[in-house]
A protein has these predicted regions:
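Short amphipathic alpha-helical segments
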Residues: 22-24, 53, 84-88, 130, ...
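Glycine-rich, phosphate-binding/catalytic loops in enzymes
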Residues: 27-28, 89-92, 134, 152
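Structural signal for interior beta-strand "rungs" in well-ordered beta-sheet cores
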Residues: 99-194
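Short, flexible, glycine/charge-rich loop motifs used to bind or transfer phosphoryl groups or to couple energy/partner
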Residues: 1, 28-32, 47, 60-64, ...
Length: 194
């Protein structure tokens, strides 16, 4: 158990979304037997010593903290900033970490990239491919035969119907409904679309 204890986990981003991800991360680690003091916030902006019971570290402090391994989930809404942070973490040997709420529904043949965040009440139906560092915020769903790129953000309540391709860095706003595509002729949401 000691090597397990010595790994350090971070929610990168201590603003509103990060504070929503932290309890999910805490619960996920508790189920894996990881002590809550091995979970921290990391933020580049100065702030209080603790937020909602977890220590707040700068990125430099996170790297300096003794740990067998470091893992970070990127709770930053901007896909562009997430991509830069993902590159920085990789260069510094910080592992991408995904966080999934306990009540997420995941059906058949769902492939997830690294670093994905799935908030409470997210549903992923069947035959779906999702790229790296995707954010699925509360009450969003992704229906059958969808392909979602890297660094895509779904705000709360996004309804992504069947046969849709969402390209890298797209940001889909709260309550958006993406109408269904046709088999063999998917609806495409372009790269970087907002």
């Amino acid at each position: 158990a000691n090597t397990m204890q010595s790994e350090l986990y971070a929610v990168y981003g201590a603003s509103g979304y990060g504070r929503e991800v932290m309890p999910l991360a805490r619960q996920q680690l508790a189920q894996a037997g990881v002590a809550p003091d091995r979970l921290v916030f990391v933020d580049d902006a100065p702030g209080p010593a603790q937020i909602n019971g977890q220590r707040l570290l700068t990125y430099a402090q996170f790297l300096a903290e003794p740990a067998a391994a470091r893992h970070a989930v990127l709770a930053i809404a901007s896909g562009g900033v997430r991509e830069k942070l993902a590159q920085r973490c990789t260069q510094d040997g910080v592992h991408a970490w995904g966080v999934t709420a306990a009540n997420v529904v995941r059906m058949d043949a769902v492939a997830l990239g690294e670093g994905v965040i799935l908030s409470p009440f997210v549903t992923l139906t069947s035959n779906i491919r999702i790229g790296r560092h995707f954010h699925g915020n509360i009450y969003s769903y992704v229906a059958h035969d969808c392909v979602i790129g890297d660094f895509v953000t779904f705000a709360p309540g996004v309804m992504c119907n069947g046969n849709i391709v969402v390209e890298d860095h797209a940001y889909i706003g709260t309550g958006a409904v993406i109408k269904q595509g046709q088999p063999g002729n998917p609806l495409v949401i372009g790269r970087g679309a907002v």
